[in-house]
Amino acid sequence: MNHRNALGTLGVTTALLASSLVWAGGQGITVLTNANVIDGTGAPVQEGMSITIDGAVITGLVAGAYAPTGEEREVIDLAGAYVTPGFWNMHVHLTTLLPHNHQLNGASLGAKVIRAGVNAMEGLRHGFTALRSTGEEHYIDVAWQEAFDEGFMLGPRIFASGESVSPTAGHRGDVERGADGVAEIRKAVRSRIQNGAAVIKIVNVEMLPDELEAAIETAHSLGVHVTAHSREPAVYAAVEAGIDSIEHGYGLTDESIALMAEKGTFYDPTIICNLSDEYIRERETRLASLGYSDDEQAVRLRTEIAYADERSPEHARHQREALAKAAKAGVKLLVGSDSMPIGEIGWLEMEQFVLSGVSEMDTLIAATRNPAELLGVLDLLGTVEEGKLADLVVMTANPLENISNIRTIRMVFKDGISVPMTPPPGTLRFYDYYDSLGPPSSFLERSESLSGFVREGNPYGGR
């Protein structure tokens, strides 16, 4: 399906929403003074800095408080708040929603388009100034990529993939969408790029070696990077074939980790989707101790999402240990949530990195610099430096002391624009929409049947 169909639907959507979320563009000169800067390079905190933003670009980063020059500019005293590069969520599906996927699959294209945009814009308010889509039907992600780029509304940067490329009978490869053999794989990759994809997502678990090589070679010849939904032994095969990044990496082995470190392959573990009952309880106990459990609705729904994807203790332990090993080996890590809402689950993914043994600094780099490097835009994004675009997150507390201080976000800037931090009047939070769906009927039985794992931590009140 050509993405213009989704864009046509999006045109109606923008007309409905534009009155409340009009893109203004970076205007004039803004100075953020008395800022403590964590620049995303791995360098220590730069204390007492002043950041000058001219339009969309950082034009000054100097030590000391701002000294008035007589020129007209807006000066914002951050009073010691912490500034990082904008966060990236590198594994996003804009329209899917655990545990309701099966009941949302029948929704109209228009409903899916609207849900995708609301999800993306709420992610921006949580500090995620850029998203990488990793599999989306009807080119809905491309439609929103173009809508935000063209300024219809203020939203995050989207690096869209369109639909995943998978062989027939593979994961995400039904009869209508599957691509089999080298010729079909090449055509599938080219058609997605022709329709606006900036990323190619493949599912290589069931791919033959020549199909895998064809997918990577074709995308690279067109200047587009490739990421793979993969589990062992397909992880090793993909890395050996030159894949740019690995998603999930189920059953990741020491041999694959060593090869990834050697070849510079990026790893997006989506660890938040690989938790056992023990780890879910560990997470919620920790957040409660830090005072982040006051929002009963958020706690209830993020827990429901977690149990919708609960894994066995053995699986969860292996994935946690693999992430720690990858970090220690120097594999370049990426932050990706897989589940939504993008903002809350993205925060949980960053927190889960630290619970898995990754340092706070390396976690921030995985959410800022590394994504920009992978996507080839490190000259413009990913760090707080002069000459780069002003995608910034301002927090009242230091995330290097406790990663959960990312929850103290005070301001977000995208292209130098200060993002409104609350939904427009009269609109719902994403969690309000999620809550309105109610507990999904028969979800637990269906998911257990598919996974072969009996979920012990049933939050649905019986079977």
Task: Name the predicted role of every residue range.
Residues 169-214, 248, 297-302:
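Active-site gating/metal-coordination segments in enzymes
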Residues 115-139, 156-163, 195-207, 225, ...:
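Divalent metal-dependent hydrolysis catalytic cores, especially in the metallo-beta-lactamase
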Residues 202-316, 340-341, 372-375, 393-396:
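Active-site core of metal-dependent hydrolases
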Residues 81-152, 171, 210, 236-241:
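Metal-associated gating/positioning segment near the N- to mid-region
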Residues 98-101, 141, 211, 236-242, ...:
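Histidine/acidic-residue-rich catalytic or RNA/ligand-binding cores of hydrolases
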